């Protein structure tokens, strides 16, 4: 059995000097350890409460590569179970979502209540004349399930920090999407799913730490939507302009702490996002006063940027995109993307949000294709022996981290930096190399203290 010491994790990651060895994106032994020590120990996004509003409502998803079903209980609480019959390991729930009174295995017909209890075994008296203790054979329950402002998370590890502590300061940034208006948020439409042939850490890192790529990877989109030859702004309708936000923002920052990451621009207009639909832009202007009252000016204006909760929950504020990177091996990830909107928005505005999210970041989105192509090409190159063992530079903004005194929390840097990426890989290495969560937390504290010297 391969152990963390066999893999020499800390020789592959050097966050103090900004180095990473790309074998971390290709090694199957590392991937198996990730399934155990990251996806088996971290809080993972399961669903939004709006997707399962009534008792018996369920939603099927994954925790790493483990299929799980999330179910609203009769008392309104939420449980999650391994989607696996206890008889011969068959899946018991197949529909993406729906409402049910029971989950019945199609192999031998064992049936489970929405509370996970085994309630029926076909031909039980004849098949088990010695008796069967059904109370012992219920579905395996995810022991830790908590919600944060509508987002449901699960964790297999009962020794892990609670969700509130796990999120830490990233919750302040997350509230900029979840808490703009009274009533919170909801998921609009279904889930778009597709597969990208790359390691899960590429998209997670980009959403945590990488605004730098947008100037170059998305150059064609910027050229099409950007300023006219005379320097004036193109008009997109409803008063919206298309000048890239990095040309007009007065400042910008990146946040990187506890493995999480975020970055955004300080803008002066409540519609400063080049990628959104005109109706969405108008909606942001019309609701700005409420958002500012609830969140303050900085977060109310924050419509452009990037975010990731370690390991695999990402979102983009202005385009209302919420996405999960489900790992499917060391060289493949399955993307699930949701459109998340204010519940108080009109149906017309919600439809405009959905159109904007799909247009830019759907499976055929004009920005999504740029990103996917980058990640796939990197993964192809890393098949080479020298390529996957040649150290990469992770030095951007190294040593420039600071804590702000204006109420914006956490370890920050200028937006064009890799503070969040270094923090993400440090948390990644600490999880893989530690036997307990307390050991992880101690290592994180020591790293962050060193960063802020």
Curated annotation (Swiss-Prot):
Binding site for Fe cation: 213, 218
Cofactor, free-text remark: Binds 1 Fe cation. Binds 1 [2Fe-2S] cluster per subunit.
GO BP term, example: 3-phenylpropionate catabolic process
An MF annotation (GO) of this entry: iron ion binding
Superkingdom: Bacteria
Residues covered by the Rieske domain: 44-142
Name of this protein: 3-phenylpropionate/cinnamic acid dioxygenase subunit alpha
Highest classification ranks of the organism: Bacteria, Pseudomonadati, Pseudomonadota, Gammaproteobacteria, Enterobacterales
Gene name of the record: hcaE
